[in-house]
From Swiss-Prot:
The gene is LIAT1. This is Protein LIAT1. Residues 106-117 have a biased composition (Low complexity). PANTHER family: PROTEIN LIAT1. It comes from Homo sapiens. Residues 145-197 are annotated as: Interaction with ATE1. The lineage of its organism: Eukaryota, Metazoa, Chordata, Craniata, Vertebrata. Participates in nucleolar liquid-liquid phase separation (LLPS) through its N-terminal intrinsically disordered region (IDR). May be involved in ATE1-mediated N-terminal arginylation. One of its GO terms (molecular function) is molecular condensate scaffold activity. Keywords: Cytoplasm, Nucleus, Repeat.
């Protein structure tokens, strides 16, 4: 060895030392970055200390520090052993002390309250928002249920006080001394007030709110007086009572004091004046003055009260008086076109009593009630005297008429020649009555020869 020179010896020694140094498994030598880090000047030793400690614990401390992670060692094996022991002691201390310190820190954080400076830091954030107010409101809400039982009693007292004040507002200066009478007065006042409100509500039943003014003193009487035929249902207790009162449901539209409103019912706007506010106005239209009170519950009662203005023409002195009371305009045609025609038609003023409640009403039908006394003492005698209303046409248009061809159809002509043959039967001459009803004027001397033959 000495012959080779000192340079060779150093190389051999270095080889020996290098072979001694790494005690780690040979498979890991090439994977570790120790060669690179050693060339950079040992800078990698600081970054790998923790990993070294973990690996040493896993290996149980027998193998010692891995040579691949340590800088190149120039000393002996004894120095390496000493360093290894020191490192183990240090790492055990640091690990144990770290765990203990962590435990103590966690306990101290749990037990130690926040410092005043930390509270000062947090307090401005809390003051910015409305959180303290919410807390106060929550606290107040928590206290409310406990006080509700005490608040409810004053509420009832306040309600009672308000009710008393409302009743007091209905009083005047002279309050009734008797409390019962005062209560009754207040009750009546409230009823009247309700009626007033109802009257205002009923104003909408007609397009013209003034239309039904004064039609009836009771504002409830015309409830539903409307063009709809169903609207009159409440007008009478019997909903059938007004059925057929008029075929046209528009006919009673606005039955009121405006003369234009009744145009279709009567040509003369004066004719129905007084049909309403006065309940006495229709008294003479029926033998029973109560019959038309409230448009009668019997629907048959007004059957003949109809719309044709020609129906009863001539039934009265004023031909316009009963216009529109019958559906058939031919019904009384020719009953007598002359209102004087029935003057004294009967001697008994009781005979026509049923036509009018006032027995004085027909007084003018004849100036002398004795004039035709013998004409028919029995008032039933003229019942059905002629079912045909045309039969009495011209029977006596003028009660004072003398013998005339139209009145004496079977008399001889004025020159004495008999131009008319004798009637042989009633059928040939329906106008002649053979039952003893011939008037003295028909028993003329000119008539005797023809009758005796």
């Amino acid at each position: 060895m000495e012959t080779r020179g000192p340079g060779l010896a150093v190389r051999a020694e270095s080889r020996r030392l290098v072979g001694i140094g790494p005690r780690a498994p040979p498979g890991r030598v090439g994977l570790q970055p120790s060669g690179r880090l050693d060339r950079r000047g040992g800078a990698g030793t600081m970054g790998y200390k923790d990993n070294d400690g973990e690996e040493e614990e896993r290996e149980g401390g027998a193998a010692g520090p891995r040579g691949s992670r340590l800088p190149p060692i120039t000393g002996g094996a004894s120095e390496l052993a000493k360093r290894k022991v020191k490192k183990k002691k240090r790492k055990k201390k640091t690990k144990g002390s770290g765990k203990g310190d962590d435990k103590h820190q966690s306990q101290s954080l749990k037990s130690q309250p926040l410092s005043s400076s930390f509270h000062d830091i947090l307090s401005p954030c809390k003051e910015r928002g409305p959180k303290p107010e919410h807390r106060q409101s929550k606290v107040e809400k928590k206290h409310l249920p406990s006080d509700s039982s005490t608040v409810s009693l004053p509420d009832f007292a306040e309600i009672e006080n308000l009710a008393n004040r409302i009743n007091e507002s209905l009083r005047w200066d002279g309050i009734l001394a008797d409390p019962e009478a005062e209560k009754e007065r207040i009750r009546i006042y409230k009823l009247n007030r309700r009626k007033r409100y109802r009257c205002l509500a009923l104003k909408g039943f007609h397009p013209d709110p003034e239309a039904l003014k004064g039609f009836h003193p009771d504002p409830d009487a015309l409830k539903g007086f409307h063009p709809d035929p169903e609207a009159l249902k409440g007008f009478h207790p019997d909903p059938e009572a007004l059925k057929g009162f008029h075929p046209d449901p528009e006919a009673l539209k606005g039955f009121h004091p405006d003369p234009e409103a009744l145009k279709g019912i009567h040509p003369d706007p004066e004719a129905l004046k007084g049909i309403h506010p006065d309940p006495e106005a229709l008294k003479g239209f029926h033998p029973d003055p109560e019959a038309l009170k409230g448009f009668h519950p019997d629907p048959e009662a007004l059957k003949g009260f109809h719309t044709d203005p020609e129906a009863l023409k001539g039934f009265h002195i004023d031909p316009e008086a009963l216009k529109g009371f019958h559906p058939d305009p031919k019904a009384l045609k020719g009953f007598h076109p002359d209102p004087k025609a029935l003057k004294g038609f009967h001697t008994d003023p009781e005979a026509l009593k049923g036509f009018h409640p006032d027995p004085k009403a027909l007084k003018g039908f004849h100036p002398d009630p004795e004039a035709l006394k013998g004409f028919h003492p029995d008032p039933e005698a003229l019942k059905g005297f002629h079912p045909d209303p045309e039969a009495l046409k011209g029977f006596h248009t003028d009660p004072n008429a003398e013998e005339a061809p139209e009145n004496l159809p079977y008399l001889s002509d004025k020159d004495g020649s008999s131009s008319h043959r004798q009637p042989t039967s009633k059928a040939e001459c329906p106008n002649l009555c053979f039952e003893g009803n011939l008037t003295p004027k028909l028993l003329h001397s000119d008539l005797a020869p023809t009758l005796l033959e």
